[in-house]
Amino acid sequence: MREVLMNEKTNLLQLEEHFYQLVDVDEPNTFRNLFPYSEVPKIAFNDRIVPHNMPEDIWITDITFRDGQQSRAPYTTEQIVTIYDYLHKLGGPKGIIRQSEFFLYSKKDRDAVYKCLERGYKFPEVTSWIRASKKDFELVKDIGLKETGILVSCSDYHIFYKMKMTRREVMNMYLSVIRECLETGISPRCHLEDITRSDIYGFVIPFCVELMKLQEEYKIPIKVRACDTMGYGVNFPGAVIPRSVPGIIYGLNTHAGVPSSQIEWHGHNDFYKAVNNSTTAWLYGASGVNCSLFGIGERTGNTPLEAMVFEYAQLKGTLDGMDTTVITELSEYFEKELGYVQPSRTPFVGRNFNVTRAGIHADGLLKNEEIYNIFDTGLVEIGRASCRERV
């Protein structure tokens, strides 16, 4: 019988959480009812609503040098260090941009890591992404990093079709690899690939429960990054899992026992939902959202980092020391140094941001700039003409 316990957060009595065990299956569950492949995916609802649970502290993590490089020509070492400097300045003294993630495979990758570490910044903390092997764990330790990302694909699409394994086999393999990481003293960040097509309560939650047991055993924090690899996540209240972002974050936090400070959301923009889903992850209990500058990433890209700067400010009521003028400086650097021109209608950085051509809007701006201006955009557009001058 489940015990009745006091919830210290809500100060209400509640039943002890159900213990979710791995559901091993002979055939993959591909949720064909939601993902028919020959048709557009379906968004279904069961109207199970979970409560808002935004952590006291929320932050942004950066993936510009990892996912951001997988869709373009690699950055040079000098370019990486320059962009890292900009990220440090943008994140402000409180380090709202908390971490930045790097490859370690090539000499150029490692040189960039060493040079960024030489800067001595507390934030963004330099972290890595590696293959799940003992040799790579030792590499992370030798470089002096405290945390690394490890890919742990969790949908049956990956488990059965890519890895040719069963759920139990793959879970045992993952736990063995993560234990090896912990043995070296490195804090693992488990990247739950393709979570929005995964069996949340049949695999993801039981796996994360085991991660929390390892954390207790080794006294080393284990983070989980919920990766919406294909951009299927939706933010609508009452949507069914595995597409429900609120449902996923609630499950990780409440049923798997992963603290908010160790939950991070990684979004893709295939259905134009990267920003909304990332904000939703904050609202329902994830402290971290993982972003790339200007959304540069695989396929349609990742969550734009600059967008989440302004989502943060709107939710918290303050920029908390973030220097948003750096966003314009970065955009200009990307154009001049890398030849990357922002699409003209991109919020905050496109050439049409804060520009109006409609006569009635122009008349309003000339009378009072607040009428058709979203806020004092001098916060962003240092060195550029004001909206009144750009009418």
Region annotations inferred by a language model:
Residues R2-K134:
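N-terminal capping/small domains of soluble enzymes
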